């Protein structure tokens, strides 16, 4: 009888082909928690730190609600102790030969391999993610990251000559993927010689386990320190002496708030924000493969966020039908069950998804869900949102996990307009069997990473990042290394925060312009150079410029907000044409401008002399300006893309794309040379520019504009003169400027960092410190080229 029942059950299984449970034991994770008495503290300087009189939060299984342990909440004293440990270890670690650092990273990779079951079980248990994703993707990728960066450390002395480690790095993680996000960022930082303090969200034990494994390796215990606490401790971490950079990974609004809070505190803030991705499906795509790509992009536990799906109208109905059928076969369950597709990410993620669905329905959207879950269930079913009106607020809001928001499009041009119409620019995939069409769409998308007929591929050697509100920091590849390096000889930055700075009043009012006294001769008035010609300012006001003897040298226009608006509009109109120019065409224009400056040398030297510059220095400044234009013209020819081979078959193109409209506020020192040194790399990399020249001596820059009026396309370069603080305010608050370089006062630098949080534009400020523009390293070094363009990784996987 028993044999009959067994045979019947086996027959039923083969008939229905239903999944059965495949649970993964979590005994090893609980055993590790028991070694800490289920009470986790912080891991600092190679040992556990469990101070008294600290509040704690429970670490729970997000699916069952079982209390696994308690985690201490850090306070400012704990943050200070972690930073002090990192500072004490910095000199020893950063001065080690690259080969020694490589050996240490390789040993850590072997330790992770040895304890991989403990790592994947603990990560799945506390995050709720499917164990097969952590086991088959996260942990192997962590080992690959360490091995790749060990190789980079070994070759650092030759490959990264002229660069040095920043110092102590502060890292603030999000609760979604704390283990993998931490690995992406600590590997390059440690490889180049930095030490790290990681602030992990409460109840995130996996980073603490990793820190323990690293600390037990021996000779360098303080290079990696992990403390547990809320993101509100970020300003406390940034304010610690010696912290040279803060890298934040999390929600967009949290990053925006952190940008405002840390203005004036730290020299560098790297932001990796949001988790939404985009999938663009054309009418010539393999629909079956694309549907599986959608599942991987949105409803697998490798996806950090939701998906915005654009489908060409010709295949809309067929794709939606197949997608809904595929959704019905997805399995939700406990993350430690090896047969589930989706786990649960806690009440906060579930509530966020439910709010988005409710708002979308109230705005007229159709919602399809694969199954239903009770209101008290930890799971949120896979959800497909469609028919959302184009003007509804949800079309601009970030899509949370596990939602897919689908919209149709007709032509490739319309698809790019819709895709680029959101303020985010993280990652995207293009699905098309026509390679030419796929490449055209991939090049047109304003994102950091594009996959062709695939989604979510990762490789340590390939840079990953974003643009716009997704942040401008990178990890992986050479770009990830430069995130933690600075040019050799750069002094360590100290906080320059001005607590008396009134952000609401800075640069708000224009100073009164008074007559300069009796005119001894004709003083030529200079207008604003906007749209390829000189024009009068909107305020119909000019300011006198006096020479070193107090005599009137000329009048320049007093620009304002209206003039900045016109300059930005002109730059946007010129941008498509200039970006599409070949490197040879851009080089020819830069060389032509250099020749024009050389012809105008006597006049420029005379202008500089009247400003108080010695004749010899003035001649050298003009000659060096000509040299800079020719040098960047030559470097244009070397631009292009680099081919990176990844582990998956198929190349990855590393493209360097223009930032877009770049605003530059020039310093007062070296009025001509600094102007040219900042303008040349911006033009060489395909940007259109809005410049504010030296306030004390703007006339040499305006003399150059007379040559640009006949040589350059209209709107390519726009020069607005006036009060520096007022124009800086207008530029920093402008939402259609893609990047801003500021070289002025410390207060101006602080305001620029604060105001840039509006559209999260990347900024480069000097914090009130002068720069040696006549030196090659600071006036024409690789840092300017790196700042003048952004990276895009374009994946081209091969195979059926």
UniProtKB/Swiss-Prot annotation:
Source organism superkingdom: Eukaryota
InterPro entries for this protein: Ald_DH/histidinol_DH, Ald_DH_C, Ald_DH_N, Aldehyde_DH, Aldehyde_DH_dom
Gene3D superfamilies: Aldehyde Dehydrogenase, Chain A, domain 1, Aldehyde Dehydrogenase, Chain A, domain 2
CDD domains reported in the protein's UniProt record: ALDH_F16
Signal peptide range in chain numbering: none
GO terms, molecular function: aldehyde dehydrogenase (NAD+) activity
Family: Belongs to the aldehyde dehydrogenase family.
Quaternary organization: Interacts with SPG21.
Name assigned to this protein: Aldehyde dehydrogenase family 16 member A1
């Amino acid at each position: 009888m028993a044999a009959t029942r067994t045979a019947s059950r086996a027959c039923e299984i083969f008939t229905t082909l239903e999944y059965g449970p495949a649970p993964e034991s979590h005994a090893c994770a609980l055993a590790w928690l028991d070694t800490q008495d289920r009470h986790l503290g912080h891991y600092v300087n190679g040992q556990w730190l469990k101070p008294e009189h600290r509040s704690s939060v429970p670490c729970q299984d997000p699916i069952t609600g079982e209390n696994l342990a308690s985690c201490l909440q850090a306070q400012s004293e704990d943050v200070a102790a972690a930073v002090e440990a990192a500072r004490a270890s910095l000199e020893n670690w950063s001065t080690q030969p690259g080969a020694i650092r490589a050996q240490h990273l390789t040993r850590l990779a072997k330790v992770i391999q040895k304890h991989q079951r403990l790592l994947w079980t603990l990560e799945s248990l506390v995050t709720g993610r499917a164990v097969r994703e952590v086991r088959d993707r996260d942990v192997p990728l962590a080992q690959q990251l360490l091995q790749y960066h060990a190789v980079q450390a070994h070759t650092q002395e030759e490959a990264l000559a002229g660069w040095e480690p920043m110092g102590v790095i502060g890292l603030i993680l999000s609760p979604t993927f704390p283990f993998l996000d931490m690995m992406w960022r600590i590997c390059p930082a440690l490889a180049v010689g930095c030490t790290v303090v990681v602030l992990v969200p409460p109840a995130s034990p996996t980073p603490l386990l990793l820190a323990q494994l690293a600390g037990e390796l021996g000779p360098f215990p303080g290079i990696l320190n992990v403390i547990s606490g809320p993101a509100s401790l970020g300003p406390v971490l940034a304010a610690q002496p010696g912290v040279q950079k803060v890298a934040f990974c999390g929600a967009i609004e949290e990053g925006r708030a952190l940008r405002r809070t840390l203005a004036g505190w730290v020299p560098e803030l790297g932001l990796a924000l949001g988790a939404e991705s985009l999938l663009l499906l054309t009418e010539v795509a393999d629909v079956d493969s694309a549907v599986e790509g959608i599942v991987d992009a949105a409803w697998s536990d490798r996806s950090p966020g939701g998906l915005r799906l654009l489908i060409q109208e010709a295949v809309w109905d067929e794709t939606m039908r197949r997608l809904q059928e595929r959704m019905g076969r997805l399995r939700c369950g406990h993350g430690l069950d090896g047969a589930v597709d989706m786990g649960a990410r806690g009440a906060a993620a579930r509530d966020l998804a439910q709010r988005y669905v409710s708002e979308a329905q109230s705005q007229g959207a159709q919602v399809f869900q694969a199954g239903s879950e009770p209101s008290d269930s930890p799971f949120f079913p896979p959800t497909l949102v469609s028919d959302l009106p184009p003007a509804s607020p949800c079309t601009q809001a970030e899509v949370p996990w596990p939602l897919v928001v689908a919209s149709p499009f007709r032509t490739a041009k319309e698809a790019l307009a819709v895709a680029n119409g959101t303020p985010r620019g993280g990652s995207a995939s293009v699905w098309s069997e026509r390679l030419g069409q796929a490449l055209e769409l991939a090049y047109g998308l304003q994102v950091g990473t594009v996959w062709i007929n695939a989604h979510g591929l990762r490789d340590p050697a390939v840079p990953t990042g974003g643009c716009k509100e997704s942040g401008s920091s990178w990890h992986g590849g050479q770009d990830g290394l430069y995130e933690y390096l600075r040019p050799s000889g750069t002094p360590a930055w100290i906080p320059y925060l001005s607590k008396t700075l009134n952000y609401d009043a800075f640069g708000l009012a224009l100073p009164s312009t008074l007559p300069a006294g009796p005119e001894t001769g004709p003083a030529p008035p200079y207008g604003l150079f906007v749209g390829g010609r000189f024009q009068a300012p909107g305020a119909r006001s000019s300011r006198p410029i006096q020479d070193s003897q107090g005599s009137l040298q000329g009048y320049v226009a007093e620009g304002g907000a209206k003039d900045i608006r016109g300059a930005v509009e002109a730059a946007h109109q010129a941008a498509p044409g200039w970006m599409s120019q070949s490197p040879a065409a851009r080089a020819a224009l830069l060389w032509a401008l250099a020749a024009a400056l050389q012809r105008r040398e006597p006049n420029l030297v005379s202008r500089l002399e009247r400003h108080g510059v010695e004749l010899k220095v003035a001649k050298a400044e003009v000659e060096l300006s000509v040299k800079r234009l020719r040098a960047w013209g030559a470097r244009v020819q070397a631009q292009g893309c680099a081919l990176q081979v990844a582990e998956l078959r198929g190349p990855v193109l590393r493209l360097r794309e223009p930032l877009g409209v770049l605003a530059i506020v020039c310093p007062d020192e070296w009025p001509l040379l600094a102007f040219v040194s900042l303008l040349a790399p911006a033009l060489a990399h395909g940007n259109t520019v809005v410049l504010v020249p030296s306030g004390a001596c703007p006339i040499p820059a305006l003399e150059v504009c007379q040559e640009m009026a006949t040589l350059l396309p209209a709107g390519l370069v726009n020069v607005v003169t006036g009060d520096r603080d007022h124009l800086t305010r207008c530029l920093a608050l402008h939402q259609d400027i893609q990047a801003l370089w500021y070289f002025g006062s410390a207060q101006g630098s602080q305001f620029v960092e604060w105001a840039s949080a509006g559209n999260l534009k990347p900024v480069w400020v000097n914090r009130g410190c002068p720069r040696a523009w006549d030196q090659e390293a600071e006036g024409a070094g690789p840092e300017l080229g790196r700042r003048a363009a952004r990276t895009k990784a374009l994946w081209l996987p091969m195979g059926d």
